[in-house]
Amino acid sequence: MNPIVKSFEYGQHTVTLETGVIARQADGAVMASMGDTTVLVTVVGKKEADPGRDFFPLTVNYQEKTYAAGKIPGGFFKREGRPSEDETLIARLIDRPIRPLFPDDFTNEVQVIITVVSVDPQIEPDIVSMIGTSAALAISGIPFNGPLGAARVGYVNGEYVLNPGAAELAGSELDLVVAGTQSAVLMVESEAKSLPEEVMLGAVVYGHDQQQVVINAINEFAAEAGKPRWNWTAPVKNEALVAQIKELAEEGLTAAYQIMAKQERYEAVGEVKKATIAKLQEANPDVNVREAADLLGSLEKNVVRGRIIAGMPRIDGREPDMIRALSVMAGVLPRTHGSALFTRGETQALVTCTLGTERDAQKIDSIMGERTNRFMLHYNFPPYSVGETGMVGSPKRREIGHGKLAWRGINAVMPSAEEFPYSVRVVSEITESNGSSSMASVCGTSLALMDAGVPIKTSVAGIAMGLVKEGDNFVVLSDILGDEDHLGDMDFKVAGTRDGVTALQMDIKIEGITKEIMEIALQQAYGARVHILNVMDQAIGSARPDISDFAPRITTIKINPEKIRDVIGKGGAVIRALTEETGTTIELEDDGTVKIASNNGDATREAIRRIEEITSEVEVGRLYTGKVIRIVDFGAFVNILPGKDGLVHISQISDERVANVSDHLQLNQEVTVKVMEVDRQGRVRLSIKEAQVKEPAAE
């Protein structure tokens, strides 16, 4: 075994790429490390494509092994299970920038597996995983137009920071991941605290500039360790068939793409394609139907793009910067804690908000450590939203990714736990879809949160931008349709407030996207965002003053931290009795904060009264009403507060002489007593005869 190793400095860390020792039967295998965070990346591709396949079957599997953090998995089986949400998101993060770098007609199956084998809690594995994937593909010999670089950019004290650690990222106003080739940005994923557009654009440019060191290092690594390139050539295009299809279908496709309603348009396009294939088969029974279908798809793309570049109206008749018709409603469901229906053209989101207590928060135990998520946003994309049938069940990768993007867009305006001590779950049900459903979810979430009385800092809206570029000519499109996303060169989603950007996601399919184009897209997105916010604010412009009658009301009180154990009781007996008997939910924190949640105000007040009883101190000179719990020869013990008993000496029972305690007191008898003394050992001396005055007793 002769290892080939390449190391280079990248930001605050040393990155090392190594091959030739592990997983030598894979087409490409790289052990990539950044500090103590190490991943094994393997790439395997099939030498032959399956006959009849008309798509590129790329699979990216990202898996975090608990041994990487020195942990044993939980659960009965004690082994890793299905991918977590974090693993799914990182797999998508790696997939998105590498997919457009494979040749257009390449349909051989390729599988990339990234395994995290060691982790430093301060260094996230995502960036080194992207670097390792790029290196493994570069040395594999598989057709790949890389290498690819990747960088994380933070923004601390007005300065950009390259690959900040977890501690530094906690104080950053920006968490942006950018990936690209030597000449082009391909992918951006970010979350920000309402930063101006120019700061966001500057971060993208900064990250792309800094990652050139990665690209150069991978090129040097591949020159030394790379396998011979596969002998693969793109299939030769049948120009005669191209011309024939253009003659038969161009006019019909042009007419079909002037139909504004999505379903009617799809039917018309389908009829044109069906008629074209039939005419081709009539003229030549041996025509390759799959090839003809592919060429029809290319013609369809050219027709739509050509009209846009020529300055003609878009598919639905809009100008490039126009937004579709908006319909905004808040409070649409009677029993939910908050709800909204946001409709933009043929895209619609029904969004609900549910409030819960701290115990409803999501507890996440990952290899990076444990964390609690008080704000959850779940996105569902049922098949009926696009007029189709399909499987319904657990969320797919796309749904998890879209939900996280919407979460990033909203998270910057969420109140702190001190301002609003609730856990919040938002669910976005996409009931209609024709482009930009994730951004509709952002708008709907902002509305539903306000309807639920969540004091978010300000309204948030999202918009999806597109691009059509031919040579030096380009058109930036606002509020893209699904077809414009599919047929265009860029998907550029921006969420934010009037003051700045809270989330930015960008996927670019071509090279040559300049800083100028991104700047125009961001400014156009700002105008669209403000327009949407104005419409949203007409429906509901700020959080409702009170939460729903159906939501739990949380009341917070403070107790002496030393009294927490008294409230909990032995084996949790006291707090369990409190919650069951009052019908409330009670949560205790180490600093003595007690949160009582209930839909019933009387139940909350009763729980507070009982907690105050348990935690209160016995006051000398105060009267208490208690029960006799034990009788002895020299007196009786009386319980005056939960967990607090005192002795009434036989001489303090009555003004008269008492010979036998049982003649005057019985077990469980209620008596009023006065506290005479609490000694150094906490023992309480009580008197019944001194309490025989006209004063109200403490309950």
Swiss-Prot record:
Record field: catalytic activity: RNA(n+1) + phosphate = RNA(n) + a ribonucleoside 5'-diphosphate
Cellular compartment(s): Cytoplasm
Cofactor dependency: Mg(2+)
S1 motif domain location: 621-689
GO biological process: mRNA catabolic process; RNA processing
GO molecular function: 3'-5'-RNA exonuclease activity; magnesium ion binding; polyribonucleotide nucleotidyltransferase activity; RNA binding
Keyword set, alphabetical order: Cytoplasm, Magnesium, Metal-binding, Nucleotidyltransferase, RNA-binding, Transferase
PANTHER family: POLYRIBONUCLEOTIDE NUCLEOTIDYLTRANSFERASE, POLYRIBONUCLEOTIDE NUCLEOTIDYLTRANSFERASE 1, MITOCHONDRIAL
Self-association state and partner proteins as the record states: Component of the RNA degradosome, which is a multiprotein complex involved in RNA processing and mRNA degradation.
Protein name (record): Polyribonucleotide nucleotidyltransferase
Gene that produces this protein: pnp
